[in-house]
């Protein structure tokens, strides 16, 4: 089992902001998962991978594709109070689910 987290590169987040947004995406997608899925994922070491996408359009394409496959997602919208000037979609968590 694996969780995938996609991060927008066009936002040019600093390392601290990026790290927090990735954590939010992981937690949100996990909280949207079933207890059995979470248990199985934990038993297998909670594998995750962070990948980059170019922009919001590409992120939304992956969101649509993931949902069409029945995968659990967690879309993160930053509140826009520190790094960004307004609410901004930053990351997408997908899964955990089977690696295929």
Give the role of each language-model region.
Residues 23, 28-57:
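Compact, glycine-rich, soluble single-domain proteins
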Residues 12, 39-42, 84-85:
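Generic, ordered loop/turn and secondary-structure boundary motif
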Residues 2-33:
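Glycine- and Gly-Pro-enriched alpha-helical subdomains that act as flexible
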Residues 16-18, 62, 86:
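Short, well-ordered secondary-structure micro-motifs
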Residues 21-23, 64-68:
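Short, solvent-exposed amphipathic alpha-helical segments in soluble enzyme
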Residues 12, 56-58, 99:
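Generic "edge-of-domain/loop-turn" microfeature
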Residues 58-64, 71:
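Alpha/propeptide regions of enzymes that mature by internal proteolysis
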Residues 4-6, 44-54, 68-100:
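Short basic, glycine-rich beta-strand/loop surfaces that mediate nucleic-acid
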């Amino acid at each position: 089992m694996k969780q995938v987290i996609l991060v927008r590169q066009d936002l040019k987040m600093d390392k601290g902001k990026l790290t927090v947004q990735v954590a939010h995406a992981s937690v949100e997608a996990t909280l949207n998962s079933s207890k059995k899925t979470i248990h199985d994922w934990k038993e297998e070491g909670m594998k995750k991978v962070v990948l980059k996408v170019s922009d919001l359009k590409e992120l939304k394409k992956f969101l649509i594709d993931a949902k069409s496959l029945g995968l659990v997602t967690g879309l993160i919208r930053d509140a826009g109070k520190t790094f960004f000037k307004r609410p901004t979609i930053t990351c997408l968590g997908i899964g955990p689910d089977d690696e295929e």
